[in-house]
Amino acid sequence: MRNQEKIFVIGHKNPDTDSICSAIAYADIKNRTTQSGKYIPKRAGQINEETQFVLNRFGVHPPGYITNIGTQVKDMDIRMSPEADKSMSLKNAWEMMQQNSIVSLPIRDKDGKLEGLITIGDIAKTYMDKTDSYLLSTARTQYRRIAETIEGTVIEGNEHAYFVKGKVLVATANPEMMKTYIEEDDMVIMGDREEDHLEAINQNVSCIIVGLGIQVTEKVIKLAHERNIVIIMSPYDTFTIARLINQSIPIRYVMKTDNLVTFSTEDYTDDIQDVMIKNRHRAFPVIDKRGRCVGTISRRNFLDMHRKKVILVDHNEKDQAVENIEKA
């Protein structure tokens, strides 16, 4: 997140005309004679009337005001995070983190504002701990995400609809036994037998998932269409489908949204160190002046901070300098 290097040219505190004009002139000379960085005049105090008159006379804008030259979060190498929204599946979030070698993924809205945070640990915990057969409906999982997770195709029904009621189960028994445990609105993972598919439709399930790339008969598709039942075809076997399917839930269901520890790009590093030590997170979201999440930082970033570069003009002693000059 670093562009052309900036070097600040600053006069002393409570600046007079000499101090302000020296900063402006020296920055201008350096910008004209070198390509090594961008030289920016700054002031360490308010401009007096005499100085303002001189600047107005020559049509020169006053330097920006700066009170502290200490290292800020924006001086760190903020790690840019890939775009991720809360509708993404756990599987896609996991793959995105693996591909980008990150352990935390900020979730943003369309304006770039932070909505939540998910970590690899959150995904692993959800996948290992959740044995609830109603998980997919509780999380309001989209059929398109389910098909994507099991590398399948929605061959009947609305892929943009959501599974909102019922449990997920594997149905391998004969049709008579299936009547005892399949309920209305369930999602059923099945084999290749047409009579099983027809019984599931008779039970008015929400979705039928067929494995091993098996082609469903036209009769089954027609009846499913009449009852608005979704049919998904996957190349995987029923065991693999059952193992993968919980990875299709949206990350909004597991992401953290409360008490998130974030930092501003304007925060000083001296002020955030204790917060980082107290909160043993691997990464912390960074928010810019416009309220957008611009990436993350970690404790490791303290090892390679970019201290501000400063040129002091019209100074006689350190006490005249801007605050934290020793850290520049």
Regions found by a protein language model. Name each.
Residues 124, 133-145, 244:
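Core recognition of P-loop NTPase motor domains used across DNA-transaction enzymes
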Residues 50, 70-71, 170-254, 258:
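Feature captures the catalytic cores and cofactor-binding loops of soluble hydro-lyases/lyases
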Residues 85-87, 153, 226:
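Short, highly charged low-complexity linear segments
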Residues 137-154, 257-258, 267-271, 317-318:
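Intrinsically disordered, low-complexity basic tails/linkers immediately adjacent to helix-turn-helix/homeobox/MYB/SANT
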Residues 113-134, 227-228:
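Anionic-ligand-binding alpha/beta catalytic cores of soluble enzymes and soluble regulatory domains
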Residues 65-75, 138-144, 239-240:
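Short linear loop/turn motifs
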